[in-house]
Amino acid sequence: MVVRYIDVETLKHETPMLAVGVFEGTETLSGWLEIIDRALGGVILRVLSSGDFRGKSGEELVLYGPENTGLKRLLLIGLGQPDKFDSESVRRAAGRAVRVAERMRLGSLSISLDAFSNFDAASTAQAAAEGAVLAAWKFRELKTDKSTGTSDVTTL
């Protein structure tokens, strides 16, 4: 697995799936999530206001991106309550993103760290990388089918 950090405009980044964290109780969007929502025609706000996705820990929802961007799929990951959020929550969210990418048989995944801007950038990036690597690890030594899962994780 290759894990790398890049600083790029989200909508111009070519990726099979971009994972974005959403806190529970989110009613307004900011940062990249607001920009992505505008590109998707407001679907993220509609999903949040309808209650179909609440941002609770463990929740996930895949949306499909517009044709004119490099964003093929958008994965909303529920982060739970902001006051209970810590580095372990980042690990779990990144791990869930990797498992969804593997379930969809995607070869790579990008994880946006924009939702974590109130936290230390270095420790957040490290926790996301740890969660992704731990979720992707599988014991394959004694297995005859050594197929690989998600092999490339990019954090934005």
Task: Kindly give the residue locations of the regions a language model identified.
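Short amphipathic alpha-helical segment within the helicase RecA-like ATPase core
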Residues: 1-156
